[in-house]
Amino acid sequence: MNAKRAIPVRERNIVLIGFMGVGKTTIGQLVAKKLYRDFIDIDQQIEKDFNMSIPEIFEKKGEDFFRKTEKEYILDICHHKRFKIVSLGGGSFKQEEIRNCCLENCLVLHLDLSWENWKQRADLLIESRPVLHNRSMDEMEQLFNERKVIYDKHNSKVATDNLSPEEVADYIVETLKIGWDLYQPM
């Protein structure tokens, strides 16, 4: 039996993907509160468990260590937890195993923000995002566009331009509830 069918749609974790700084954590917390679900931010969980910031982990243990740890956390949540709202780090969905597991076992929502709106936030993000360190705006745009191709593998896309986090969260919750009401298990 397909693993996706084994998990009832209402019980599936909701996974938020998108480029760094699009609002996955803020929106995820709001959605979790509105749906009475637990919220898990993968990056925050790793920081807590290792008692280091992501930039420190990159510096002291390396990106490969971080990506391996990130994968372990995400696969565990996908396979062993239900009813969660999960925010993935901006680069985690690049890993095929993570992508496939999330798409098979969860509902994956792509929070989509235009480059024009994202670059207005760039100065606030660079210090806390090691992947952005020492990159020009052109290099950041290239990374943004490369990742967008990966984020196109999702169950649903939510355009977030010119919307507040509260408005995005309300839209997600309303859409999920409609989908859950329409879904009839076979």
From Swiss-Prot:
Keyword S-adenosyl-L-methionine: no
Top-level lineage group: Bacteria
Entries under InterPro entries matching the protein: P-loop_NTPase, Shikimate/glucono_kinase, Shikimate_kinase/TSH1, Shikimate_kinase_CS
Requisite cofactors: Mg(2+)
Binding-site residues for Mg(2+), renumbered to this chain: 25
Annotated positions binding substrate: 43, 67, 90, 147
UniProt-listed GO biological process terms: amino acid biosynthetic process; aromatic amino acid family biosynthetic process; chorismate biosynthetic process
Cofactor details (free text): Binds 1 Mg(2+) ion per subunit.
Compartments where located: Cytoplasm
One MF annotation (Gene Ontology) recorded for this entry: ATP binding
Pathway the protein contributes to: Metabolic intermediate biosynthesis; chorismate biosynthesis; chorismate from D-erythrose 4-phosphate and phosphoenolpyruvate: step 5/7
Binding site for ATP: 21-26, 129
SUPFAM superfamilies, per database record: P-loop containing nucleoside triphosphate hydrolases (SSF52540)
Disulfide bridges in this chain: none
One Gene Ontology CC term in the entry: cytosol
Assembly description: Monomer.
Described purpose of this protein according to its UniProt entry: Catalyzes the specific phosphorylation of the 3-hydroxyl group of shikimic acid using ATP as a cosubstrate.
Entry similarity comment: Belongs to the shikimate kinase family.
UniProt cross-references to PANTHER family, sorted A to Z: SHIKIMATE KINASE, SHIKIMATE KINASE 1, CHLOROPLASTIC
Record-given protein name: Shikimate kinase
Organism: Bacillus subtilis (strain 168)
Taxonomic lineage of the native organism: Bacteria, Bacillati, Bacillota, Bacilli, Bacillales
Gene, per the UniProt record: aroK
